[in-house]
Amino acid sequence: EGSVKVDGFDILEEPEEVKKRIGYMPEFPPLYLDMTVQEYLNFVSDIKKIDRVTKKRSMEKIMDLVKIGDVRKRLIKNLSKGYRQRVGLAQALIGAPPVLILDEPTVGLDPKQIIEIRNLIKDLGKEHTIILSSHILPEVSAVCERVLIINKGKIVASDTPENLSKRLGDT
């Protein structure tokens, strides 16, 4: 029982307002492979009804932030897995949502790309609430300040990564 609010908006009473405040990157971002990076991000901006002035201003910032500006004119199908993940993250950032939900953001990346994406997530955590879904415990420890373990829909543990490691290591 209870209610869930995002940025002060109840998810049942004002779902459209809630959706505007959440950016989501699934494990396998649904990218249009025959679009360039810039075309795809413009397409997502249009879907999210971002006005032209805001779109132009924020697009450069987002591409710089996730380090994809140098591939903006390349077709997505010609990008590495790491760059595709960055494009997926960029689309989640469109509209400046205060909450980001990232599902297994480093799956399939090489070690260098994993470090880069983890550092990017930590940086994003300074300005966004990030909900990270991961089964990779070293990743959780590397990027999270707080961890919730959910089993069958129930929160079974909530603490810092360090404290959880100590508690779970002792059992």
Where do the protein language model's features map onto the residues?
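ABC ATPase "signature
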Residues: 158-159
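Catalytic Walker B motif of ABC-type/P-loop ATPase nucleotide-binding domains
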Residues: 100-104
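Conserved ABC ATPase "signature" region
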Residues: 42, 46, 53-71
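Conserved ABC ATPase signature
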Residues: 75-79
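Conserved ABC transporter NBD signature motif
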Residues: 2-10, 17-18
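A short, proline-enriched helix->beta-strand linker immediately N-terminal to the Walker B motif
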Residues: 94-98
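Helical segment within the ABC ATPase nucleotide-binding domain
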Residues: 114-126
